[in-house]
Regions:
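Signature of N-terminal electron-transfer/Fe-S-associated modules in redox systems
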Residues: 1-142
Length: 142
């Protein structure tokens, strides 16, 4: 960051502010599987605290720490834009949605074993429409 500040002729604090504000910048090493748990209001109301509990149990008690095998790390983040599928988490570039504590633990164990499970809804949702919403073609999707 000091190099970037010097290169851009700006104060170091300005570079630091950007690097610590955006979750896509990491100030310490992350695992092969980087888990971001959404804890904004919609996800929290629907149980994201259970996802955090699962991460603490299966990966590391502290955010940002690597798992014992070094493959996984996790953090809490603000809205990931999939509120209708709450609670959810992003693993690398993929969204895992409609989660509960048990499903989250299964996903985390699969990552620790380097055999990731399929991303998407874990409740059988076919799209991200609200529950019982009918598409313009008349099909109901849950």
């Amino acid at each position: 960051m000091k190099y970037i500040a010097k290169y851009l002729s700006m104060p170091y604090i300005n570079v630091y502010e950007v690097a610590t504000f955006y979750t896509m910048y990491n100030l310490s090493p992350v695992g092969k599987y980087f888990i971001q748990v959404c804890t904004t209001s919609p996800c929290l109301i629907r149980g994201s605290d259970k996802l955090v509990k699962a991460c603490k149990e299966k990966i590391s008690n502290e955010m940002g720490e690597l798992s014992k095998n070094g493959k996984c790390s996790w953090i809490e983040v603000e809205c990931l834009g999939a509120c209708v599928s709450a609670p959810m988490m992003q693993i690398n570039e993929d969204y895992y949605e409609d989660l509960d504590e048990t499903k989250t633990k299964e996903i985390l164990v699969s990552l620790i074993n380097d055999k990731p499970l399929k991303p998407g809804s874990y409740r059988g949702r076919k799209n991200t429409s609200p529950e019982k919403f009918k598409n313009i073609d008349g099909d109901k999707h849950a």
